Regions:
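Hydrophobic alpha-helical membrane-embedded segments
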Residues: 67-77
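Interhelical loop and helix-boundary elements at the membrane-water interface
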Residues: 1-6, 21-62, 75-176, 181-188, ...
Length: 235
């Protein structure tokens, strides 16, 4: 119980402090809603580090993620009813933040249970999520600014661009490869191949996912490709 409370305190402190700082910066510097959206995106990604470091066993992290899922609905109800808070973010479609947050937390729970609980490897939790998260955040910014060549494929989201998807692929590859090197147990050539295949699958998932579903789809796709390949190459 002591370990669980300590881990929960660390993870909660990170989330509260990071969000408070983001809101403070938004109020003081008047950054755009889109910039704040991406800031919160990276704050959520950062929460996986205390989640995988502060807890000593996987089921403590899974319980923490489950508690977050139980709390997020009333929190978002309050968010929508407090003028100071509801004015911080502009939804691109009705229920965007509720849906995105719920999917992000379910992705957190799934990756913790499968990668850490079943496979016994907390590093693969980070690799599965960061295969999507970092690239998605950067690719969105690149795509909006430089995405002049839209992907003309019937299964792809009409808003996706070649430039954004290439950026997604590069960031996904680098994220997975870096974490595999830190983790160890995989040769350099195998790490490159695993990272490239995981990045390609995640980029394809992000390209086809619509209405924010990439938040759940992409980490799951990355995990589905990454875990068998790591096992195959003796990791």
């Amino acid at each position: 119980m002591r370990d669980f409370l300590l881990g929960s305190s660390v993870a909660t402190a990170y989330i509260v402090i990071a969000i408070a700082l983001a809101v403070l910066v938004q109020r003081l510097c008047r950054i755009s809603s889109e910039a704040l959206r991406k800031t919160l995106h990276f704050i959520l990604l950062g929460s996986y580090i205390p989640l995988t470091v502060a807890f000593s066993v996987w089921w403590h992290a899974a319980i923490f993620a489950s508690v977050l899922i139980a709390l997020v609905f009333p929190f978002l109800l309050i968010l929508n009813r407090v003028p100071l808070l509801s004015g911080l973010l502009v939804e691109r479609w009705r229920g965007e933040y509720f849906g995105s947050m719920m999917m992000a937390l379910f992705a957190m729970l799934i990756t913790v249970c499968v990668c850490w609980g079943y496979c016994g490897d907390r590093y693969l939790v980070l690799a599965s999520v960061y295969a999507w998260g970092i690239g998605d955040g950067v690719a969105a910014l690149v795509g909006r600014r430089y995405g002049n060549h839209k992907i003309l494929w019937r299964f792809a989201d009409a808003h996706k661009s070649v430039e954004g998807s290439l950026c997604m692929l590069a960031c996904s590859f680098l994220s997975v490869f870096t974490l595999l090197i830190i983790r160890g147990g995989i040769s350099m050539p195998a790490g490159i191949l695993i990272s490239l295949l995981t990045g390609a699958a995640t980029t394809l998932g992000e390209m086809c996912a619509r209405n924010g579903l990439d938040t759940l789809v992409c980490p799951t796709v990355a995990m589905g490709v990454l875990l068998p390949l790591v096992r195959l190459f003796g990791g």
